[in-house]
Structure formats: C-alpha cells, structure tokens
Amino acid sequence: DEVNEALRACVDHGIYGYVRPSASCLQAAASWQQRRHGFQAKPEWITVTPGIDCAMATAVQAFTDPEDKILINTPIYDPFFEVIEKNDRVIVDSPMVLTNGRYEFDWADFEVKIRGCRMWMFCNPQNPEGRCFTEEELRKAGEICGKYGVWMLSDEIHGDIVYDGRKHIPLASLSEEFCGRTITCTSPSKTFSVAGTA
C-alpha cells in the first residue's frame, strides 16, 4: 500500500523528471543497510541513479579511465560486459570454477589477472548462480585487491533476497579499508518488486 500511495503522490504532483532525493530518503537507505546487514553506511555516501546498470556505469566512469582493465568472474550478470565495453574499458575474465555444484574463485588465476586492473566488478549474491559469498572469500578478494590498489564494485542488488539461513555480507562492511575502496550498488527494485518505478 505504501508503494502505491507514493506512486499516486508522484502522479498527482505531475512532474515526471528526475528529482533530488530527500534527506529522509537517503537516511532510510542507510538505515536499511544497518538494520538488515550490519553495514553502517552514511547518507552522504549515497548517490541515487535511475537503475543498477546506470550506477555501475557511473562508477566505472568515475573510478577508471578509458582502456583501463576491469576484472570480472564469469558466469556473471550479462550487463557487466556492456557496462565495461561501452565505456571503452577492457574486460579481464577470471572464470569461476564449478566444484561440487558450486562456483568458486580460482584464487591463483584471480591474483595473476588482477595485476594491472583498475577495478574488480562482481555480484554478491552472485548472479546468475545466486550464491552468497562467505566472509572468508570476501576478505581474501578484498585483500588481493588492496595489495594491487584495485577498486571494488560490488553489485548487491539481490542482497535482501537470501534463503535457507544464508547471510548476505556487504563487502564494504568488513573493514574501513574495504569500505574506502568499495562502490556498493544496490536498489529497492528486487527487494520490494518495484523495478521501473525510479
């Protein structure tokens, strides 16, 4: 009902352009991260975009330069390819390894290929597989990225949709160092089934 009421208020207002989010909107987003995931995001850290792909493209443009290399781990959400290539960046793939029905990082390959990259882009929970990465995996990836001065872009749009006692851990929540080098992309669109209403 709250979503429908908010949409009606927007329609009644009659202005359909992009608007600057209110302070209460940014505070609500930060508070949600704290309550749901224990991540103490600050409202002033939040930048609102029209969608997750736009958020990723904006981060790629802000934190890398044309011809910079960006590491991904396939299989991955298909728009990652487009975001990287349409912004004239270079894809470096460190494929995940299917082990006992579960995709895992190939750490040796990851560390070799991250050298010379400017950014690592990944999904957590992983899309298309849906697996939540463990704290150990996230820490290891974050430490490797830190060793080589690599920005980390974490697409966490499915972070609120986890089942069977699993827990979503935001990468940026694990340390101040990780927080300072992580761009977290999230959205209410999956959690509340409101895609296309931005």
Q: Positions of the model-derived regions?
A:
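N-terminal small-domain helix-loop-helix segment of the aminotransferase-like
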Residues: 1-51, 58
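Conserved PLP-anchoring active-site segment centered on the Schiff-base-forming lysine
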Residues: 62-84
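A short helix-loop-beta submotif of the ANL/AMP-binding
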Residues: 86-92
